[in-house]
Curated annotation (Swiss-Prot):
The keyword Transmembrane applies. It catalyses: Cleaves type-1 transmembrane domains using a catalytic dyad composed of serine and histidine that are contributed by different transmembrane domains. One of its GO terms (biological process) is proteolysis. The keyword Hydrolase applies. Keywords: Cell inner membrane, Cell membrane, Hydrolase, Membrane, Protease, Serine protease, Transmembrane, Transmembrane helix. The chain crosses the membrane at residues 94-114, 143-163, 175-195, 196-216, 224-241, 245-267. It is a multi-pass membrane protein. Belongs to the peptidase S54 family. GO terms for cellular component: plasma membrane. NCBIfam families: PRK10907.1, rhombo_GlpG. It comes from Yersinia pseudotuberculosis serotype I (strain IP32953). Disulfide bonds: none annotated. This is Rhomboid protease GlpG. Rhomboid-type serine protease that catalyzes intramembrane proteolysis.
Length: 278
């Protein structure tokens, strides 16, 4: 038997197995620490399965896969769907860096509530002038500042969703590099327009959006992706920020800078990928 792939989503794995069954290919699902494994009994069918898998990874939510489950008369796997607590779900979908940044942001936000924004910003904000340039933590620490509950919830939700899958699939070092690079460049871009009076993880989040989306489009075998609809919404939200539609103070330059950095890093990292969008 040959292991074909590991998929984190059991329902998607079942849909692919059922779809291949309609092509007279028998696949088996087995539990795995990262989700489930799909195994092929007949090695002679491997090339056909790999071809269909490529198509599946490009569009796993295509109705033909769900329709195959109904045709096979099997909409559930024999594997149990376990119930997890919110904390277990949070931890299972994130690595140590993802969780550490979340804890750090929450701790700093609580400190800002207690001591006031300016007291914390005096230590962590983007360098105010050249005398602070050697305080190198400032080039990144501004990303951990948040000024409202909605601000921190929105950013940490995206950070967990995108950073978690990136760290799980590509490793902690890859996420660390993207976080540092995007924090520096998004902070620099925003400082050109607002000085040092800004903060938030959104520049890094937009870098993650760009990286995860483009990597998923060009190299789906890496196992990370952002649905096109969510990416389109994010771009529209970015554009809306320039028109002050919601009356919010938005770090537009940080968003744009972060998105560009994420796209550039993803393009570079997938430059040798054989699977690109046609």
């Amino acid at each position: 038997m040959t292991r074909v792939i590991v998929i984190s989503n059991l329902r998607l794995a079942q849909a692919f197995v059922d779809y291949m069954a309609t092509h007279h290919v028998a696949l088996e699902i087995r539990p795995d620490a990262q989700g489930v494994e799909i195994w092929l009994a007949d090695d002679e069918q491997l090339s056909a399965v790999q071809h269909e898998l490529e198509q599946f990874l490009l569009d796993p939510l295509n109705p033909r896969y769900q329709a195959a489950s109904w045709q096979a008369g099997n909409v559930n796997s024999n594997l149990p769907y376990q119930r997890f607590s919110y904390l277990q779900t949070l931890r299972s979908q994130a690595g140590p860096l993802t969780l550490s940044v979340m804890v750090l942001c929450i701790a700093i936000y609580i400190l800002m509530l207690i001591t006031g924004d300016m007291a914390v910003m005096s230590w962590l904000a983007w360098p105010y002038n050249s005398s602070q340039y050697l305080q190198i933590w400032r080039w990144v620490s501004h990303a951990f500042l948040h000024f409202s509950l909605l601000h921190i919830l929105f950013n940490l939700m995206w950070w967990w969703y995108l950073g978690g899958q990136m760290e799980k699939r590509l490793g902690t070092s890859k996420l660390l590099v993207l976080t540092i690079v995007s924090a520096v460049f998004s902070g620099w871009g925003q400082s050109l327009f607002s000085g040092a009076n800004f903060g938030g993880l959104s520049g890094v989040v937009y870098a993650l959006m760009g990286y995860v989306w483009l990597t998923g489009e060009r190299a789906p075998e890496h196992g990370i992706s952002l649905p096109r609809g969510l990416m389109a919404f994010s771009v529209l939200w970015l554009i809306a920020g320039y028109f002050d539609i919601l009356g919010l103070s938005i770090a537009n330059a940080a968003h744009v800078s972060g998105l560009i950095i994420g796209l550039l890093m993803a393009f570079w990292d997938t430059r040798n990928s054989a699977r690109t969008v046609q």
